[in-house]
Amino acid sequence: MGRGKIEIKRIENPTNRQVTYSKRRNGIFKKAQELTVLCDAKVSLIMFSNTGKFHEYTSPTITTKKVYDQYQKTLGIDLWSSHYERMQENLRKLKEINNKLRREIRQRMGEDLGDLSIEDLRGLEQKMDASLGLVRERKYHVIKTQTETYRKKVRNLEEQHGNLLLNFEAKCDDPHYGLVENDGDYESAVAFANGASNLYAFRLHQAHPNLHHDGGYGSHDLRLA
Protein backbone atom coordinates (compact mmCIF):
# COMPACT_ATOMS: atom_id res chain seq x y z
CA MET A 1 0.00 0.00 0.00
CA GLY A 2 1.47 3.33 -1.07
CA ARG A 3 2.07 6.33 1.12
CA GLY A 4 -0.66 8.94 1.28
CA LYS A 5 -0.18 12.38 -0.17
CA ILE A 6 1.04 14.91 2.38
CA GLU A 7 -0.73 18.25 2.28
CA ILE A 8 1.71 21.13 1.96
CA LYS A 9 0.71 23.86 4.39
CA ARG A 10 2.20 25.84 7.22
CA ILE A 11 2.92 23.85 10.36
CA GLU A 12 1.11 25.61 13.20
CA ASN A 13 2.99 24.08 16.12
CA PRO A 14 6.23 26.09 16.59
CA THR A 15 8.21 23.14 17.92
CA ASN A 16 7.19 20.83 15.08
CA ARG A 17 7.83 23.60 12.59
CA GLN A 18 11.38 24.14 13.88
CA VAL A 19 12.13 20.40 13.87
CA THR A 20 10.89 20.04 10.29
CA TYR A 21 12.93 23.06 9.20
CA SER A 22 16.12 21.65 10.71
CA LYS A 23 15.64 18.22 9.10
CA ARG A 24 14.82 19.55 5.64
CA ARG A 25 17.57 22.16 5.80
CA ASN A 26 20.12 19.47 6.51
CA GLY A 27 18.68 17.42 3.65
CA ILE A 28 18.97 20.31 1.20
CA PHE A 29 22.55 21.05 2.27
CA LYS A 30 23.39 17.37 1.82
CA LYS A 31 21.98 17.42 -1.72
CA ALA A 32 23.96 20.60 -2.48
CA GLN A 33 27.15 18.92 -1.28
CA GLU A 34 26.40 15.88 -3.46
CA LEU A 35 25.90 18.13 -6.50
CA THR A 36 29.25 19.78 -5.77
CA VAL A 37 31.11 16.48 -5.54
CA LEU A 38 29.32 14.38 -8.18
CA CYS A 39 28.69 17.03 -10.82
CA ASP A 40 31.43 19.57 -10.07
CA ALA A 41 28.69 22.18 -9.69
CA LYS A 42 29.14 25.52 -7.99
CA VAL A 43 26.35 25.84 -5.42
CA SER A 44 25.52 28.64 -3.02
CA LEU A 45 22.57 28.38 -0.62
CA ILE A 46 21.34 31.02 1.83
CA MET A 47 18.53 30.27 4.25
CA PHE A 48 16.80 32.18 7.05
CA SER A 49 14.49 30.50 9.52
CA ASN A 50 11.24 32.11 10.66
CA THR A 51 13.14 33.33 13.75
CA GLY A 52 15.73 35.03 11.56
CA LYS A 53 18.53 32.53 12.12
CA PHE A 54 20.95 32.45 9.19
CA HIS A 55 22.32 29.33 7.48
CA GLU A 56 24.33 28.98 4.29
CA TYR A 57 26.24 26.50 2.17
CA THR A 58 28.77 27.37 -0.51
CA SER A 59 30.77 24.96 -2.61
CA PRO A 60 34.43 24.81 -1.56
CA THR A 61 35.50 25.75 -5.10
CA ILE A 62 33.77 29.14 -5.07
CA THR A 63 32.90 32.06 -2.80
CA THR A 64 29.60 33.80 -2.27
CA LYS A 65 30.93 36.99 -3.91
CA LYS A 66 32.00 35.06 -7.01
CA VAL A 67 28.54 33.52 -7.22
CA TYR A 68 26.94 37.00 -7.13
CA ASP A 69 29.43 38.36 -9.67
CA GLN A 70 28.76 35.49 -12.05
CA TYR A 71 25.01 35.92 -11.53
CA GLN A 72 25.18 39.61 -12.44
CA LYS A 73 27.41 38.94 -15.44
CA THR A 74 25.15 36.19 -16.75
CA LEU A 75 21.95 38.25 -16.43
CA GLY A 76 23.58 41.56 -17.35
CA ILE A 77 22.37 43.35 -14.23
CA ASP A 78 23.99 45.23 -11.35
CA LEU A 79 22.63 44.32 -7.95
CA TRP A 80 24.51 47.11 -6.19
CA SER A 81 24.06 50.08 -8.53
CA SER A 82 20.67 51.17 -7.19
CA HIS A 83 21.81 50.70 -3.62
CA TYR A 84 25.00 52.66 -4.29
CA GLU A 85 23.03 55.46 -5.93
CA ARG A 86 20.77 55.72 -2.88
CA MET A 87 23.81 55.88 -0.63
CA GLN A 88 25.30 58.65 -2.75
CA GLU A 89 22.04 60.61 -2.63
CA ASN A 90 21.81 60.28 1.14
CA LEU A 91 25.44 61.39 1.46
CA ARG A 92 24.78 64.44 -0.71
CA LYS A 93 21.78 65.46 1.43
CA LEU A 94 23.74 65.02 4.64
CA LYS A 95 26.56 67.20 3.27
CA GLU A 96 24.06 69.92 2.37
CA ILE A 97 22.58 69.84 5.87
CA ASN A 98 26.04 69.93 7.42
CA ASN A 99 27.13 72.90 5.29
CA LYS A 100 23.93 74.77 6.14
CA LEU A 101 24.42 74.23 9.86
CA ARG A 102 28.05 75.33 9.66
CA ARG A 103 27.01 78.48 7.80
CA GLU A 104 24.38 79.27 10.44
CA ILE A 105 26.97 78.83 13.19
CA ARG A 106 29.36 81.22 11.45
CA GLN A 107 26.59 83.76 10.96
CA ARG A 108 25.67 83.63 14.64
CA MET A 109 29.33 84.33 15.34
CA GLY A 110 29.11 87.43 13.14
CA GLU A 111 30.74 85.88 10.07
CA ASP A 112 29.54 85.36 6.47
CA LEU A 113 26.95 88.15 6.73
CA GLY A 114 27.77 89.83 3.42
CA ASP A 115 25.35 87.77 1.31
CA LEU A 116 22.37 88.17 3.67
CA SER A 117 19.45 90.38 2.69
CA ILE A 118 17.69 92.71 5.12
CA GLU A 119 15.03 90.05 5.72
CA ASP A 120 17.71 87.44 6.41
CA LEU A 121 19.46 89.77 8.83
CA ARG A 122 16.22 90.48 10.67
CA GLY A 123 15.49 86.78 10.90
CA LEU A 124 19.00 86.12 12.21
CA GLU A 125 18.57 88.89 14.77
CA GLN A 126 15.30 87.41 16.00
CA LYS A 127 16.87 83.96 16.32
CA MET A 128 19.80 85.36 18.29
CA ASP A 129 17.45 87.35 20.56
CA ALA A 130 15.47 84.19 21.23
CA SER A 131 18.66 82.25 21.94
CA LEU A 132 19.89 85.01 24.22
CA GLY A 133 16.62 84.91 26.13
CA LEU A 134 16.95 81.17 26.65
CA VAL A 135 20.55 81.52 27.83
CA ARG A 136 19.62 84.34 30.22
CA GLU A 137 16.68 82.36 31.58
CA ARG A 138 18.90 79.37 32.18
CA LYS A 139 21.50 81.55 33.89
CA TYR A 140 18.93 83.03 36.29
CA HIS A 141 17.61 79.56 37.04
CA VAL A 142 21.10 78.30 37.90
CA ILE A 143 21.78 81.36 40.09
CA LYS A 144 18.47 80.92 41.91
CA THR A 145 19.09 77.22 42.48
CA GLN A 146 22.60 77.80 43.81
CA THR A 147 21.41 80.66 46.04
CA GLU A 148 18.67 78.52 47.58
CA THR A 149 21.19 75.73 48.16
CA TYR A 150 23.60 78.09 49.93
CA ARG A 151 20.79 79.54 52.04
CA LYS A 152 19.76 76.06 53.15
CA LYS A 153 23.35 75.31 54.12
CA VAL A 154 23.57 78.58 56.09
CA ARG A 155 20.28 77.86 57.88
CA ASN A 156 21.47 74.38 58.78
CA LEU A 157 24.74 75.74 60.14
CA GLU A 158 22.92 78.44 62.11
CA GLU A 159 20.56 75.83 63.54
CA GLN A 160 23.46 73.61 64.54
CA HIS A 161 25.25 76.58 66.11
CA GLY A 162 22.12 77.56 68.03
CA ASN A 163 21.66 74.03 69.31
CA LEU A 164 25.27 73.92 70.47
CA LEU A 165 24.85 77.22 72.33
CA LEU A 166 21.64 76.07 74.02
CA ASN A 167 23.27 72.83 75.04
CA PHE A 168 26.33 74.66 76.32
CA GLU A 169 24.29 77.21 78.29
CA ALA A 170 22.21 74.44 79.81
CA LYS A 171 25.34 72.70 81.02
CA CYS A 172 26.79 75.96 82.31
CA ASP A 173 23.64 76.53 84.43
CA ASP A 174 24.37 73.27 86.22
CA PRO A 175 26.51 74.23 89.27
CA HIS A 176 28.08 70.79 89.34
CA TYR A 177 29.02 70.74 85.64
CA GLY A 178 32.75 70.84 84.98
CA LEU A 179 33.81 70.31 88.62
CA VAL A 180 35.39 66.92 89.22
CA GLU A 181 37.08 65.90 92.44
CA ASN A 182 40.47 64.36 91.68
CA ASP A 183 42.67 63.54 94.68
CA GLY A 184 41.83 66.75 96.42
CA ASP A 185 42.11 68.91 93.28
CA TYR A 186 39.15 70.48 91.53
CA GLU A 187 38.98 71.21 87.82
CA SER A 188 36.60 73.48 85.98
CA ALA A 189 36.34 72.43 82.32
CA VAL A 190 34.13 75.14 80.87
CA ALA A 191 33.97 78.94 80.90
CA PHE A 192 32.79 81.72 78.58
CA ALA A 193 35.09 84.60 77.62
CA ASN A 194 33.52 87.84 76.25
CA GLY A 195 30.35 85.99 75.29
CA ALA A 196 32.20 83.73 72.83
CA SER A 197 32.31 79.99 72.93
CA ASN A 198 36.00 79.84 73.91
CA LEU A 199 36.67 77.05 76.36
CA TYR A 200 39.16 77.35 79.16
CA ALA A 201 40.16 74.91 81.84
CA PHE A 202 41.03 76.03 85.35
CA ARG A 203 42.63 73.92 88.00
CA LEU A 204 42.86 74.34 91.76
CA HIS A 205 46.16 73.18 93.20
CA GLN A 206 47.45 72.93 96.72
CA ALA A 207 50.85 74.36 95.77
CA HIS A 208 52.19 77.94 95.79
CA PRO A 209 51.30 79.07 99.31
CA ASN A 210 52.25 82.66 98.42
CA LEU A 211 49.08 82.90 96.25
CA HIS A 212 46.70 81.99 99.10
CA HIS A 213 44.15 84.57 100.22
CA ASP A 214 42.54 84.89 103.56
CA GLY A 215 39.04 83.54 103.33
CA GLY A 216 39.67 82.75 99.68
CA TYR A 217 40.65 79.42 98.26
CA GLY A 218 42.39 78.36 101.43
CA SER A 219 45.04 75.82 100.54
CA HIS A 220 44.19 75.94 96.82
CA ASP A 221 45.30 78.27 94.06
CA LEU A 222 43.73 79.06 90.67
CA ARG A 223 45.68 78.91 87.43
CA LEU A 224 44.97 78.54 83.70
CA ALA A 225 45.52 74.95 82.60
From Swiss-Prot:
Keywords: DNA-binding, Flowering, Nucleus, Transcription, Transcription regulation. Gene3D superfamilies: Transcription factor, MADS-box. Residues 1-61 form the MADS-box domain. InterPro entries: MADS-box/MEF2_TF, MEF2-like_N, TF_Kbox, TF_MADSbox, TF_MADSbox_sf. The keyword Ribonucleoprotein does not apply. One of its GO terms (molecular function) is protein dimerization activity. GO terms for cellular component: nucleus. Residues 84-174 form the K-box domain. GO terms for biological process: flower development; positive regulation of transcription by RNA polymerase II; regulation of transcription by RNA polymerase II. Expressed during flower development in stamens, petals and carpels. Expressed in fruits and seeds. Its main location: nucleus. It comes from the Eukaryota. It is found in: Nucleus. PANTHER family: SERUM RESPONSE FACTOR HOMOLOG. Probable transcription factor involved in flower development. This is Agamous-like MADS-box protein TM6. It comes from Vitis vinifera. The gene is TM6.
